[in-house]
Every structure is written in C-alpha cells, then in structure tokens.
C-alpha cells in the first residue's frame, strides 16, 4: 500500500505522484494544516476514489472492454468546489513477476532466435544482482559460476517496464540452470526463481 501525501508549500497544494502495481492500493494523508482536501479520480476516465485518510483506496483500471496497456497513468483531482486545480497522478505498472522459467531449447554456437521473457512487469530501470548458474553436460560434468546466467547468455533489461529477457549464444552443450535477483525502480523484489534451458 502506497501513501500519497497532500502538502502545501508557499500556497501551492501538491498531491504526491506515486508509482504502484496493480496488486497495490493507495491511501491519502492530508498534511496541509490550512485546508481539507478530497481527492477524486477523474470520473470520465477511471471513476471515483474514496475520500482521503481512509485505510486504503483501490486504483481502478480504465473503463475499457480490453485490458489497459501498461504502464498507464491514473489522473485525479480534488472534488471540493474551488479546488479543481489540485490534481494528482498515479503511475500503474504490471507486478514484477517471473516469466518463462523453462526456456525453449537452443543449439550451441547459435544465437537465441527470439529473446525469452524471464521477468515481466515492474518499473524500469531494473537492478540485477546475484546471478548464479550451473551447467551440466551430457556426461554429468558440472560447471558452476556467478556474475552471469551461463556461458554465452546474458540478461537484457528493458527500458519500457516490460521486464527482462535472455539473449546471447550458448557456448556449452548441456542443461543450463540459473537464478538471479531483480529489484525494480519502485522497490519491488523478485528472487529465488529457478530457470533452466537445454542446449544441444
């Protein structure tokens, strides 16, 4: 749940801009000691929201028969007469989640034909850490390492908040197993996901 602070500075009222994913709610805290405020999501776009200082407020999706594109922007304003110039913005993203965990088989020395989406959603930029891999060949010989997801492979984070893909050219025949940690720009964390790919 994300807090949205309502503040006043030199006579200007500001509704804090926040970024959330679709699994999160928001709540408003009025820190303006001079006046009350009542944020309301734009009725022509997203419908009304509860009044400030409630325990939680659901941010609805656009009224459309189709799923909204992500990320999308929810705009709202104060519904108190005379306060219509007080507006706020909520950036809404898909949750950070694991994508494909069993990757399509690949051939040694051949570039992966299409990048494989291993992480979806979240807010870019992404921070990737703790990459660990193990490759087991057809004779049972094991190669372990860290700092990458395996010989010839790499993680490619997107800049448009769509997630992370695997690209590259595998250089070892065998089964690649790897894991890594991802943190996104709004503080979401994804870890302890096991991925695998067979290379012939």
Positions of predicted regions on the chain:
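Short, low-complexity Ser/Thr-rich regulatory SLiMs
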Residues: 157-159, 170
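Disulfide-braced loops of extracellular cysteine-rich modules
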Residues: 147-149
């Amino acid at each position: 749940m994300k807090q949205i602070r309502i503040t006043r500075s030199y006579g200007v009222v500001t509704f804090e801009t926040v970024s959330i994913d679709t699994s999160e709610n928001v709540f408003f805290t009025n820190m303006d000691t001079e006046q009350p405020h009542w944020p309301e999501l734009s009725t022509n776009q997203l419908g009304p929201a509860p009044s400030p200082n409630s325990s939680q407020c659901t941010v609805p999706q656009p009224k459309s028969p189709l799923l909204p594109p992500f990320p999308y922007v929810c705009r709202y304003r104060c519904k108190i007469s005379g306060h219509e110039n007080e507006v706020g913005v909520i950036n809404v993203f898909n949750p950070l989640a694991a994508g494909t965990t069993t990757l399509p088989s690949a051939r040694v020395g051949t570039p992966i034909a299409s990048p494989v989406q291993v992480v979806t959603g979240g807010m870019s930029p992404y921070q990737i850490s703790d990459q660990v891999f193990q490759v087991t060949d057809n004779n049972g010989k094991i190669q372990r390492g860290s700092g990458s997801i395996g010989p010839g492979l790499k993680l490619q984070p997107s800049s448009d908040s769509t997630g992370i893909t695997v690209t590259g050219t595998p250089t070892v025949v065998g089964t690649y197993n790897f894991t890594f940690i991802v943190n996104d720009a709004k503080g979401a964390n994804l870890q302890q996901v096991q991925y695998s790919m067979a290379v012939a």
